[in-house]
Amino acid sequence: MQTSPLLTQLMEALRCLPGVGPKSAQRMAFTLLQRDRSGGMRLAQALTRAMSEIGHCADCRTFTEQDVCNICSNPRRQENGQICVVESPADIYAIEQTGQFPGRYFVLMGHLSPLDGIGPDDIGLDRLEQRLASEKISELILATNPTVEGEATANYIAELCAEAGVEASRIAHGVPVGGELEMVDGTTLSHSLAGRHKIIF
């Protein structure tokens, strides 16, 4: 079937989004054109501005339109002395929603993966080393994902911390709240048992 070249181009562009296949892209394109053209225009304008104006924070490497993001420039956060290392900016949003972390962050934008040719410098560890040497950091919290690559990355960074004389800690992994033990995989259960804590009354 012959369709409008612009419509085809729109559907192809929408497929760059994760989880969006041909059918989903077609549905999105038709919905915007049929029912919400003003929404489509707002989306286009927001995308254009974001793609051209959003860069990386000079300190933590998260997304921001400023030289230094709001978290890194916050005096209270600076005084705290804790830095949480995460794999992506999305992880910062997840942690910030808990309201439990008062420090700053460092975003790797990935993890070590020798098989894919991703080494320490590719995920900004040279910059992290500079910060370990020049800043007064009380604790580096390693919040990389609980995958083989995430664990390897955390161990590598922990070695950098040891060399710099900075305390390093790893976030706990274990049974999710509301979960049932029989549904938990063996590796997660092993982490839960190893990371158990005493109940004090």
UniProtKB/Swiss-Prot annotation:
Please state what the protein is called. Recombination protein RecR
Q: What exactly does this protein do?
A: May play a role in DNA repair. It seems to be involved in an RecBC-independent recombinational process of DNA repair. It may act with RecF and RecO.
Originating species: Salmonella choleraesuis (strain SC-B67)
A GO MF label: DNA binding
Q: Which HAMAP family does the UniProt entry name for this protein?
A: RecR
Ranges where the Toprim domain occurs: 81-176
Q: Which UniProt keywords apply?
A: DNA damage, DNA recombination, DNA repair, Metal-binding, Zinc, Zinc-finger
The similarity comment for this entry is: Belongs to the RecR family.
Give the top-rank taxon of the lineage listed in the UniProt record for this protein.
Bacteria
Known PROSITE patterns for this protein? RECR (PS01300), TOPRIM (PS50880)
Q: Where are the zinc fingers (C4-type)?
A: 57-72
Family annotation (NCBIfam families): recR
InterPro entries tied to this protein: DNA_Rcmb_RecR (IPR000093), Rcmb_RecR (IPR023627), Rcmb_RecR_Znf (IPR015967), TOPRIM_dom (IPR006171), TOPRIM_RecR (IPR034137)
Q: Does the keyword Ion transport apply?
A: no
Please list the GO biological process terms of this entry.
DNA recombination; DNA repair
